[in-house]
C-alpha cells in the first residue's frame, strides 16, 4: 500500500541528499521515479535538485498553478512509475498536497516529500502545514546548531550577516542567507528571549 511521506527539517540537514539517494536506490533496481522541484528555487539552475555535497539530478518543475495529479497521471500513460519524489515541498499549495494524496490513494504510487517545516519567523509554510496534517508518515531530518543542540529553526541574514526579522516569507537563498539554529539561539538572535 502506497503512502505519503514528509521528511522535514531546517536548512542544511540533508533533505536533497536524502531525496537523491532515494531516487538512486529506486533507479538502481530498474524502478522508475519522477522527481519534482520548485520552479521558484533556481539557485543551481532551473529543473535541478542539487545537494550541498555536490550531487544533482534533473527534475520536473512545479509552480503554484501545477496540477501534480494530472501531470503524474499523464506520465503514467507512457511509463510505469514506482515513486514520486518532491524537493522543496514547503512551496506546495494546499491543493497540491491534496493532489499528491490522490496520487497515493488513487494511483497507488508512494510520494516522498522533502521540505522545510518553518520559515525564518518560525511560521509554517503552506505546503509543510498540510503535509504535517495529511501525510501518512512524518520523519524529521536533524542538523545541529553552532552550540551543539538540535537545530530546528532558521535565521534569515542580510548582506552584512545581521538577522532579519521581517519581510516576505519566501526569499530564495542558501548558506549565505540562512542559518540553522536551536530554539534558544533563535529566540536570542530575534530578541524574543525573556530575561
UniProtKB/Swiss-Prot annotation:
Catalytic activity field: thymidine + ATP = dTMP + ADP + H(+)
EC number: 2.7.1.21
GO molecular function: ATP binding; thymidine kinase activity; zinc ion binding
Record-annotated active site: 88 (proton acceptor)
Gene3D superfamilies xrefs: 3.30.60.20, P-loop containing nucleotide triphosphate hydrolases (3.40.50.300)
Binding sites annotated in the UniProt record for ATP: 9-16, 87-90
Signal peptide as annotated in the record: none
Keywords, alphabetical: ATP-binding, Cytoplasm, DNA synthesis, Kinase, Metal-binding, Nucleotide-binding, Transferase, Zinc
Statement: the UniProt record of this protein carries the keyword Kinase: yes
Binding sites annotated in the UniProt record for Zn(2+): 145, 147, 182, 185
Cross-referenced InterPro entries: P-loop_NTPase (IPR027417), Thymidine_kinase (IPR001267), Thymidine_kinase_CS (IPR020633)
Database matches in Pfam families: TK (PF00265)
One GO-annotated biological process of the protein: DNA biosynthetic process
Coiled coil feature spans: none
GO CC field: cytosol
Location in the cell: Cytoplasm
Summary of subunit composition and partner proteins: Homotetramer.
Family: Belongs to the thymidine kinase family.
HAMAP family (alphabetical): Thymidine_kinase
NCBIfam families: PRK04296.1-5 (NF003300)
Name of the molecule in the record: Thymidine kinase
Organism: Mannheimia succiniciproducens (strain KCTC 0769BP / MBEL55E)
Amino acid at each position: 500500500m502506497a503512502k505519503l511521506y514528509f521528511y522535514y527539517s531546517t536548512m542544511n540537514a540533508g533533505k536533497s541528499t536524502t531525496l537523491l539517494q532515494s531516487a538512486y536506490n529506486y533507479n538502481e533496481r530498474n524502478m522508475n521515479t519522477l522527481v519534482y522541484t520548485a520552479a521558484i528555487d533556481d539557485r543551481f539552475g532551473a529543473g535541478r535538485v542539487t545537494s550541498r555535497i555536490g550531487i544533482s539530478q534533473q527534475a520536473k518543475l512545479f509552480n503554484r498553478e501545477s496540477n501534480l495529479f494530472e501531470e503524474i497521471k499523464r506520465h503514467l500513460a507512457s511509463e510505469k512509475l514506482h515513486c514520486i519524489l518532491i524537493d522543496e515541498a514547503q512551496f506546495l499549495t494546499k491543493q497540491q498536497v491534496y493532489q499528491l494524496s490522490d496520487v497515493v490513494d488513487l494511483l497507488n504510487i508512494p510520494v516522498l516529500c522533502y521540505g522545510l517545516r518553518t520559515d525564518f519567523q518560525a511560521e509554517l509554510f503552506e505546503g509543510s502545514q498540510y503535509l504535517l496534517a495529511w501525510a501518512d508518515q512524518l520523519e524529521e531530518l536533524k542538523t545541529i546548531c553552532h552550540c551543539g543542540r538540535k537545530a530546528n529553526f532558521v535565521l534569515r541574514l542580510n548582506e552584512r550577516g545581521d538577522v532579519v526579522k521581517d519581510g516576505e516569507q519566501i526569499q530564495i537563498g542558501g548558506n549565505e542567507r540562512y542559518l540553522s539554529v536551536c530554539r534558544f539561539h533563535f529566540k536570542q538572535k530575534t530578541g524574543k528571549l525573556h530575561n
